[in-house]
Regions:
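Catalytic glycan-binding domains that act on GlcNAc-containing polysaccharides
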Residues: 1-165
Length: 166
């Protein structure tokens, strides 16, 4: 996949504290509540609920036993059900895609997720930036679009044309 192991480890560390905190809420309860009691996000979570039920059937999970986050994310990488169905892989080739209990499948699935969402091997993953025409330059990672009002200027050209979103 071309994704550095440090990036995958960082994501799994942030999302589930390396698998030690994968969520304690029943996924079916989270998704049902968010689907029907929160109109602003109802459409999104109804899609997740449908995907969760399909995933449970496809992977032979008991939908009443799976725990995850309050938003219905599951496993080491905290995949939502639609991402689990599309992007989870059987990285250890044991015949099962298990990103909830199997760290090997989770590692491969995080790499697959990044690759399928535009990861480019050997591309810059952070860009040093400084404030334009300001006295105190900043060297940190910024989301460029969100912070346009700060007049941030990357020190190197950034190419966005190859990135994609699903």
């Amino acid at each position: 996949f071309g994704v550095p192991k440090e990036i995958i480890a960082s994501i799994i560390g942030i999302e589930s504290s390396y698998g030690s905190i994968k969520g304690s809420t029943r996924v079916i309860d989270s998704l049902t509540t968010l689907s029907f009691d929160y109109p602003r996000r109802s459409k999104f979570f109804k899609i997740q609920l449908e995907n969760f039920l399909l995933l449970s059937r496809e992977e032979n999970f008991n939908p009443l036993e799976l725990n995850g986050s309050y938003a219905g994310a599951m496993g080491y990488g905290q995949f939502l059900p639609d991402s689990y169905r599309r992007l989870a892989i059987d990285f250890d080739e044991d015949g099962v895609r298990d990103i909830i209990n199997n760290p090997v499948d989770a590692i491969g699935s995080v790499a697959n997720y990044l690759k399928r969402n535009g990861w480019q091997k050997d591309a810059d993953i952070a860009v040093e930036a400084s404030l334009v025409d300001k006295q105190n330059p900043i060297s940190t990672i910024w989301k460029m679009k969100k912070n346009e009002h700060l007049e941030l200027k990357p020190k190197n050209q950034i190419e966005f044309n190859d990135l994609k979103s699903e």
